[in-house]
A protein has these predicted regions:
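N-terminal amphipathic alpha-helix/helix-capping segment at the start of soluble metabolic enzymes
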Residues: 1-31, 226, 230, 333-341
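Glycine/alanine-rich phosphate-binding loops at beta-alpha junctions
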Residues: 9, 45-46, 65
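Active-site-adjacent loop and "lid" segments of alpha/beta metabolic enzymes
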Residues: 13, 38-55, 71-85, 112-137, ...
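Catalytic-pocket segment enriched in acidic/His residues
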Residues: 34
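Catalytic domains of carbohydrate-active enzymes, especially glycoside hydrolases
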Residues: 51-67
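Short, low-complexity intrinsically disordered segments enriched in A/P/G/S/L with frequent Arg
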Residues: 89-90, 94-104, 110-116
């Protein structure tokens, strides 16, 4: 495997510009939800969430990503039981092999196809006090808001957020791109293969077709951004690991991730504690998926692979181990290009 050569690229945010590619930037996750798969509502209280965010910054996070609606396994969004949602978002190969009419139904999919599971008002009520508290304590902090809703994006940007991280890549709420353009925000556009309620009906794709599908989806997101007046230098792309991809597809995508750099924008990868990592570790856990708390070493291995395949930003839950891993991977990249470590 040849290490990828990242380009040094500016990323223009709402009030500042970051340099991407010289070293890997660490985006620390702050979940402000009662049902996050990773931390189970530990930081729903605003004071606890702010304290956690400040700890992540002290551990070396370059950016913070604040989310107030869970889009991960174990969520109870829209009234769905956690196991129902987990199967909708990260279905097993058995689930995915069933014809659509035989697949198990969930309450999450239809809601996401229609109205959001968490209203924008509730999302803002969770999010804004934490965002404001972080910026009071650390005015220099760079905050991203993880949302696909126009109203939430507007409120967060007005409150000082620099970045909108949209898991739908501007595909689920048509107004959000215009808001990002209005505020001159940085944006992260992620690829999601359809919507969660549709994923079980989708066939497994061979690597070439999978990469073409991800490329086409990200190209559509770039077109939506351009139509809204968002300049390319404000955009980072995310391949969307775990979002509408089976276990084998995630690894195929990771192995060929660097080919997405041909789209002309830097890459962000969110691999931390993902369920496909837990499934891969199942032989070590009696045939069961590795529990969340046991996935950190696998997360770091995936993080290193992503960096060596062209990622400029990694989105993580445990910041200090990610900082250390990124330093080693960046040293490999520097050696590959013949530059200083």
């Amino acid at each position: 495997m040849n290490a990828c050569r990242r380009n040094i690229t500016p990323w223009r945010l709402r009030s500042r510009t970051l340099e991407l590619g010289r070293r890997t930037l660490i985006m620390g996750v702050v979940n402000i939800t009662p049902d996050s798969f990773s931390d189970g509502g530990r930081f729903l209280d605003p004071e606890a969430a702010v304290a956690h965010a400040l700890e992540l910054l002290d551990e070396g996070a370059d950016l913070l990503d604040l989310g107030a609606e869970s889009t991960r396994p174990g969520s109870r969004a829209g009234g769905a039981a956690g196991s129902e949602y987990a199967r909708a978002v990260h279905p097993t190969d058995e689930d995915l092999s069933l014809p659509p009419q035989e697949a198990k139904t969930t309450s999450w999919g239809p809601r996401l196809l229609g109205t959001p599971a968490v209203s924008s008002e509730e999302e803002q009520a969770r999010l804004l006090p934490v965002l404001e508290g972080i910026l009071r304590a650390r005015p220099e902090a760079i905050a991203s808001v993880d949302t696909y809703k126009t109203a939430t994006a507007r409120a967060a940007l007005a409150a000082g957020a620099e970045i909108v991280n949209d898991v739908s890549g501007f595909q689920w709420d048509p107004g959000i791109a215009a808001v990002c353009a209005e505020f001159k925000a940085g944006v992260v556009l992620m690829h999601t293969r359809g919507r969660p309620g549709e994923w079980r009906a989708q066939p497994q794709l061979p690597p070439d077709e999978l990469l073409a599908t991800v490329r086409a989806g990200l190209t559509a997101s770039l077109a939506a951004a351009a139509q809204a007046g968002i300049p390319p230098e404000s955009i980072v792309l995310d391949p969307g690991y775990g979002f509408g991809k089976r276990l084998a597809e995630n690894y195929a995508l990771l192995a060929r991730q660097a080919e997405l750099l041909s789209l002309g924008r830097p890459l962000l990868a969110g691999l931390s504690r993902k369920s496909f990592l837990g499934h891969t570790l199942a032989p070590l856990f009696g045939g069961n998926d590795a529990p969340i708390e046991a996935r950190e070493p696998a997360s770091l291995a995936a993080l290193a692979a992503a960096i060596l395949h062209g990622t400029s930003i990694v989105r993580v839950h445990a910041v200090r181990p990610a900082v250390e891993t990124a330093l080693i991977a960046d040293a490999v990249l520097a050696a590959a290009r013949g530059g200083p470590m």
